[in-house]
């Protein structure tokens, strides 16, 4: 990478990000702007993918809401996310868990790692 670009992006990287992987259940506290108000919305689900590197890295979180699958993609280093909590650690053997989209109920469960 160009040293100039690298030096500019190093100052924007966040250091308060916990380590999490696909298969982990996370609780993302995202800032939502509605008109002139700003509030925190919690989105809890399973991380199904992590993509990119450096400042452009992002992750996809999937949850089931009222029987409908909802996925949101968050950049890791965005100021719009106040904090990320890891609720549980999952044991999976894939880096991308897109196959969970086709599974329902107990088949979509992920084995938990005790830490």
UniProtKB/Swiss-Prot annotation:
Family statement: Belongs to the bacterial ribosomal protein bL19 family.
Assigned keywords, A-Z: Ribonucleoprotein, Ribosomal protein
HAMAP family in alphabetical order: Ribosomal_bL19
Function: This protein is located at the 30S-50S ribosomal subunit interface and may play a role in the structure and function of the aminoacyl-tRNA binding site.
The UniProt record lists the keyword Ribosomal protein: yes
One GO-annotated biological process of the protein: translation
CC per GO annotation: cytosolic large ribosomal subunit
Source organism superkingdom: Bacteria
Gene (UniProt): rplS
Protein name, as recorded: Large ribosomal subunit protein bL19
Organism: Streptococcus pneumoniae serotype 2 (strain D39 / NCTC 7466)
Gene Ontology MF terms in the entry: structural constituent of ribosome
